[in-house]
Amino acid sequence: MNESERKIVEEFQKKTGINFKNEELLFRALCHSSYANEQNQAGRKNVESNEKLEFLGDAVLELFVCEILYKKYPEAEVGDLARVKSAAASEEVLALVSRKMNLGKFLFLGKGEEKTGGRDRDSILADAFEALLAAIYLDQGYEKIKELFEQEFEFYIEKIMKGEMLFDYKTALQEIVQSEHKVPPEYVLVRTEKNDGDRIFVVEVRVDGKTIATGRGRTKKEAEKEAARIAYEKLLKERA
């Protein structure tokens, strides 16, 4: 880590109260592949992205969620548990948890990802959260993960079990728009962009021909979901 990176790592620990023995693990968890590639191409040696930690974190998350389900819902059918596990470990839920702890603020992103709104993209936040789980697991063990996140995930799991939270921003946006305008929102692919060699889809969501939000993603579906989320949150603020 250089000095500016260390300051961000230290600020993350101060703001969240999650203190690492090995700060390099935390740095790696916060390091998106676009940033690692950019730094390595600039001549730095062995700047590693969070992809391997994300791989481990996916398994840690699955165990964590399954343990909560096994203990709290002993009478539930296996099929129901599998459905809830999938929802509780979904990109949408992980992005919610990430936003609550302001994880996006501390991510190291390449210039392209920064420019295209990667800091608040569900997929990037969810991947970074999984990487963070792995880093905590390696640094402080599984019990620390339970201490930090068990209560929050129990809350989401309970809502999912009750059918109150299988959240779909596109459906939620459509309900608001149709109640006010009597027509569904329209999703329009306006262009594609290049970012570190990857194609980024840019989608506008429109109501009565007027653009209300723009989303970006590595697939058209992801860009539509992002546009729907931004539009939904914007409309909620306007209603408040």
Swiss-Prot record:
Locations listed in the record: Cytoplasm
Name this polypeptide is given: Ribonuclease 3
Gene, per the UniProt record: rnc
Required cofactor(s): Mg(2+)
Active site: D58, E130
GO BP annotation list: mRNA processing; regulation of gene expression; rRNA processing; tRNA processing
SUPFAM superfamilies in alphabetical order: dsRNA-binding domain-like, RNase III domain-like
An example Gene Ontology CC term for this record: cytoplasm
